A protein has these predicted regions:
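A short alpha-helical cap/connector motif
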Residues: 1-149, 157-182, 186-219
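Active-site residues of response regulator receiver
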Residues: 153
Length: 219
């Protein structure tokens, strides 16, 4: 009898997800993530300062990614940013269970990209993934074909237009009609983009992890 609490049935994948979930550095009882010195991750705008601490989606978000990709029979998935590969595990498991395809991830920090590749290899999913190390505004300009599903969950960036908005403007033309986009951080200018009907999306906020934006491309 299957004892898993989520939609992924592969014990090898679930074991890696469980390990990553256990190692996320959070205070007992919740609260913001901190480093060994007690510094709040949200207060630091330098992604290299947190290379040893993988930022991960919530398991509910991961399960939703898997189910949406399965429902779409997604064969081409993109994500910004990969971090240590938690979201990539859910997406790649779905693509594999759909019959094959590719998950294209972008990660600025080499140490995180290496860790993600190691985690995906451990899960038996590395052959489905293309991790592009570098600035997503460059690495995601050509995703090789129509994108079925996109995750936008990158570093907030400095002042000015958010990286989420900048990356979305680059990727949006590559998303097929009917394709979906999930956003974790709810950057104001990103939300303005996906909620403007002129940009071809319909969007809503789901009550997951304090607000997860889910958008579908309609034209």
């Amino acid at each position: 009898m299957n004892q898993t609490l989520g939609p992924i049935l592969d014990p090898q994948v679930n074991a890696v997800i469980a390990r990553l979930e256990e190692t996320r550095r959070r205070p007992v009882g919740g609260g913001p993530r901190t480093d060994a010195a007690g510094n709040n991750a949200a207060s630091n705008q330098d992604p290299y300062a947190w290379a040893d601490y993988g930022f991960s989606i919530h398991p509910d978000q991961g399960n939703l990614i898997y189910l949406l990709c399965r429902a779409q029979r997604a064969a081409r998935v993109a994500e910004f940013a990969t971090s240590v590969g938690m979201s990539t595990l859910y997406a790649a498991a779905a693509v594999r269970d759909n019959g094959g395809g590719v998950v294209i991830g972008s990660e600025l920090v080499p140490a995180k990209a290496f860790t993600a590749w190691r985690n995906l290899t451990e899960a038996g999913l590395a052959h489905l993934v293309d991790i592009r190390q570098g600035d997503a505004r460059e690495t995601m300009r050509d995703l090789g074909g129509p994108v079925d599903f996109m995750l936008v969950d990158g570093w907030p960036g400095a002042q000015g237009p958010s990286l989420a908005r900048q990356v979305m403007e680059i990727v949006a033309p590559q998303i097929r009609v009917g394709g979906m986009v999930m956003n974790d951080n709810g950057e104001e200018d990103y939300l303005e983009f996906v909620r403007d009907p002129a940009n071809g999306f319909r969007s809503m906020t789901l009550p997951i992890k304090g607000g997860t934006e889910l958008s579908v491309k309609v034209n």
